[in-house]
Structure formats: structure tokens, C-alpha cells
Amino acid sequence: MGRTDDVINVAGHRLSTGAIEAVLGTHPSVAECAVIGVADDIKGQVPRGFVVLKAGATGEGLVDELVAAVRENIGAVASLKRVDVVAALPKTRSGKILRKTMRGIADGRDEPLPSTIEDAGVIDALRPTLVS
């Protein structure tokens, strides 16, 4: 498994978000991606994906393809609750994706922005998607 914050618990199954991201990242239209675990009343947590498209790629049919790829490569328990195509992912100046911040906002917490954030405008643009 990887770091503790990269492991989510879906209905009693421990899943690596990194493994799910690896599947999403193999799609030819995906430039970069992130997967977070969001709270779910029934399963505890469910995986939710965010993808940035490569230049010239379209999102038509992409979500269905990504969900199917995760189900095929990892299994139904890892099936993504939702996949959002976004313009950019929030990162630190060193390039680390701010998954903890994304997870907190998605779960409805007032998550402070880390001082190391590269561009606070990215999280501001992503906030409506995270809370919906």
C-alpha cells in the first residue's frame, strides 16, 4: 500500500489511491490525475477522481472509459463514485498534489490552504467542483 493518506477504506476494503491513479494515468487523454477518498454514509469512503486532459483531447466518453478501466484493472470495489475533468490540480511549489486539502474541501471542512501552494487560484477554481 503506500503512505497512510493514500489508502482509503471502502466498505472495509483498503484501497490505494495511487493504484487507482495509475490506471487513470494510462488513458491516452489524461495528462495528470488525482484520486481522493470522500465520505460516504454507506461505504465509509468512496474514491473520487479528478483528471486533467492532454492538449487537444476531448472529454467525450472519457468518464465512462475511466470508470470501466478501474473496474477491470482493480475491481468493482474500487469503482469511482465520480470523475471530474478539471483544468488543473492544486499543487505545492515542489509539484505535490494537495490531496489532503482537496479531500477536506470535498468532505465539507474549512480546509486552510498550505503556505507552500503554488497557485491558490487553482483551488479556488476547483472548490465548486469539490463541494458539488
Where are these predicted regions, by residue range?
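AMP-binding/adenylate-forming catalytic core of the ANL superfamily
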Residues: 1-78, 97, 101-104, 109, ...
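A short, flexible beta-alpha/helix-coil linker loop
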Residues: 5-7, 88-91
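Short, acidic, Ser/Thr-enriched surface-loop or helix-capping motifs
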Residues: 41, 91-92
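General small-molecule cofactor/ligand-binding pocket signal
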Residues: 83-86
